[in-house]
Amino acid sequence: EVAWVWQANNYGPEVDYQFKSTPTYIDGILYTVAGQRRTVAAIDPATGETLWTYREPNTTRWERSMRQNYGKGVAYGEIDGRGVIFYTSPAFFLHALDAKTGRHIEGFGARVPLEGFPQTGVVDLLVDLLDDWAPWEAWDQPYDPDFGIPRELGFITTSSPPIVVNGTVVVGNSAEQGYNQTRIENVPGDILAYDVSTGDFKWKFHFIPRPGEV
């Protein structure tokens, strides 16, 4: 017998086979993502009632993302005993949300200078991914947090949620999907890590080893 149905397509067009999110159950609440904008939702598991939602503001980076429909879930951590939901967006931002209210965590990350973004609780992952990458360092243009990486240089996004381990939020990424790649070179898919309490950058694992790293 079906107890209740939660309509994910209330948060954007139905995405058929591409909707792959696995809900996470923590302290009596279900958490998931839904829709092309990867809206985060907290759900009462007894009734199916939506307790809160968060949807990232529109950006050019989101419009260009090839992983809009591929959000697979969220991660959970704690800051001084306070439950925190971590998720990565198709535009490649890391968000830290209060598990009870859905509001962004104070003192985490840095302000993203884009309309609609909160003053705190967000990390622009592109900044750290591009840092020390030679093609970007040679690119004679200022960084635009709305536009992201120029197509001439590459493309990067993410579909998987981060993981939280030993006080660290670890973030992966995704390049172009499928077997029909459009470029020979792309942004390296390096793994990024951040402090779970502050959002401060901790380390980067180079998938393509740099001199002296092998």
Regions found by a protein language model. Give the residues of each.
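Aromatic (tryptophan-biased) beta-strands that constitute blades/sheets of beta-rich domains
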Residues: E1-E14, E49-R64, R103-R151, D200-I208
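Repeat-blade elements of multi-bladed beta-propeller folds
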Residues: D16-T39, S65-F93, G154-Q181, P188-D190
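Extended catalytic-interface subdomain
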Residues: V171-G172, L192-V214
